[in-house]
Amino acid sequence: MTDMYASLRSNVGTLGQILGDTIRTHMDEPFLDKIEQIRHLAKSSRQGNDTAREQMLTLLAALPDEELVPFAKAFNQFLNLANIAEQFHTISRNCDELVCVPDPVDQLLGRMLNGRIDQDKMLECLQTLDIDLVLTAHPTEISRRTLIQKYSAVVDCLATMENPQLTEREKKQNHLRLRQLIAQIWHTNEIRHERPTPVDEARWGLSTIEASLWQAIPDFLRQLNEQVEERTGKQLPSDIAPIRFSSWMGGDRDGNPFVTAKVTQEVLDRNRHTAARLYLKDVVLLVNELSMEEANEELLALTDNSHEPYRVVLRELRQKLRDTIDYLNARLEGHSPEVDLDSLIWHEDDLKQPLTLLYRSLTESGMSLIANGLLLDMLRRLACFGIHMLRLDIRQDAQRHSDVIAELTRYLGLGDFDHWDEHEKQAFLLRELSGKRPLIPHNWEPSAEVAEVISTVRLIASQSPKALGSYVISMASQPSDVLTVLLLLKEAGCQHPMRVVPLFETLEDLNNAASCISALFAIDWYRGYCKGSQEVMIGYSDSAKDAGVMAAAWAQYSAQEKLVKVCNQADIKLTLFHGRGGTIGRGGGPAHKAILSQPPGSVDGRIRVTEQGEMIRFKFGLPKLAVQSLALYTSAVMEATLLPPPEPKPEWREAMERLASDSVTAYRAIVREEPDFVAYFRAATPEVELGKLPLGSRPAKRRVDGGIESLRAIPWIFAWSQNRLMLPAWLGAGEALQQAADRGELTLLREMEQQWPFFETRISMLEMVYAKAEPNLAKYYETCLVPQELHHLGEALRSRMATGIKVVLELTQSDALMSHTPWNRESVELRNPYIDPLNFLQAELLARTRKEQAGSSNVELALMLTIAGVAAGMRNTG
């Protein structure tokens, strides 16, 4: 890499050298030499040396079974260590200017206050921001939690290395710690022996909060307060919470039979338990800190003029938190303890009121400096996390709710709900929603699947509203899908109005989303229920799998525009929930860019976004990194609200309509209409083998017997990223752009790319995907794994990809992909010589296991390690 990345290169070199020493100690010198030889051959092969490529393939094919696992592990761990070094580089004091952008919030405040936006308007926007980041597990984080903790410790060592004041002895101790950690990593199994349970996934999410976000939230808000005070002279309120966190881990039952009402209850208890435990740590520290005697009259009266009034209040809180933890421990162990609710932290105010009193007393007694330390941090954590830590969303497929009502109407002799038309369904549902008598008879014994849905809504009814987020209905298409859930909640005795959120996923459903919501607003009962606000979820993964990325992106944009219009006309506040994945094929990409490319008026200070699997670690895994990510989200939502992008010109819309139409035709011509496509996909990728990898808790398919359409978006993307063709992230888009160029529209496309954030984002995402893709490697998989009679399809796909790259370079008037983002390009180029050998070995091992039907345990484990290694190198799974 170039000199501007010298510190990154140095860290990668140090970690690589220690890993090499570890391998030499565990294996031997000849084995390490072989790894180095293959690495050098991979580099030469990248530069077009065919002899080096042949030598590398010969060496890989000759690896004995006992060397397969350590070989795959060596390259896998190098890539993980390179990721750590790169992640650390973005927060390092030696970070170069191309990588470390200035603080986005500070920049935005400067731009806004230089005459463009009124100060009061800016402050009002900041204080009413409602950004909800929803942690999900299903793409799935491929690294084990035990390894992630070790990776964090490696980062601590890298940070220590930057301290210029270290003595020689301290440097040696730090280097020894680094060697110990890398040895621990080497000797730890990277592949789980069993799939994680939904509870395991929820615990992983909680560990991210404990390890990083718990510290990052007060750090970020302190930084934000300083920036605002510096520019406006005003302080932010102590309870400001521009960003909060929700979760799907333990609440998302769509296609996951392992998420039951019992599991959801356990996760809710674990969330509360973690919050209570972390607040207890804060209170223990505050007992030590707040030893002062001076207080305001309110606090002195409450504590009988105690000499240590702050400690009196804090000791009582400390005991309540300990009792709460004991109570939740008993519940998690399966007991039903009887308790006096007054002795527990049961509501947010049980913590907020006493802490606010202490804060007020300190500030009124001239001790603001003390008040604005740990006490303010705790108040801000409370405003962000509450006493439940994460608000748990519930998600279920629309058909599962319909099945409940259908089974019930058949039992009651009313006919079959599933066979009624939409008008009949709505009439029945509204009649029951408006009525007072219960619909479900006491003596009814429903089927197991229906009983599980009923158990879930009853669980919701028993919870505090602040423990839960939204009820998301996947594959929603009609108003009756929403009304059905509302009726089930009513029947369960739910006293609080829960947000019921339709998720529009397919191309057709996205196109009909606005008319569905408009029909709901036309119902008086529903208008009364929603109380002036509506949340709608936009699905990115399934729409892209259904129609390709270009057509899906335009459908998502158009759906949002229409939803904004419908809600504005009805005078209802719209919150859009973006179900993005980590990868481009699932709507992923830089969050800041993505938010600023939304239609004008669609953000308006409110947004929900899923943060998925491995992206949670990349964005929030370290406190300083998390502060950066929180600042990016805050600045993007403020900018999209106060300085929205321009409305697209009519000719841009027309061009996008043509691009969407051409791209979906090209995409479906392959994925749906090409008779050999499924056979090619199964042969050319490790899709079948991925099903054996113990990743997330959720099955890879919605239906066991289904084809591509039943395959979840995540394994669909994961499989294509393994053989480096990256097909879902570009298929259809390049062909549509080429057709536009052939029509003489290149000048128009350039104008769109330069002036329209939505289109510029689409093109830059395409560039990134093309840069990560490796058609020559995909061809090697084909040679090893695909029957000769299907090779024509691979040739056609690679030809389409070449066309796409050519037209994107013409459009951007660039000589090379990602020339305007050198950091990203360097990052890809750094990894390639380490990913390539894993890809070549993976193809070899796939061929072996498929030929022999039952491979040795060494071969199977090595194959799993290559899958994990390629995922680490590509920095995405699904």
UniProtKB/Swiss-Prot annotation:
NCBIfam families: PRK00009.1. Forms oxaloacetate, a four-carbon dicarboxylic acid source for the tricarboxylic acid cycle. Its EC number is 4.1.1.31. This is Phosphoenolpyruvate carboxylase. The active site is at H138, K545. GO terms for molecular function: magnesium ion binding; phosphoenolpyruvate carboxylase activity. The gene is ppc. GO terms for cellular component: cytosol. It comes from the Bacteria. It catalyses: oxaloacetate + phosphate = phosphoenolpyruvate + hydrogencarbonate. Its cofactor is Mg(2+).
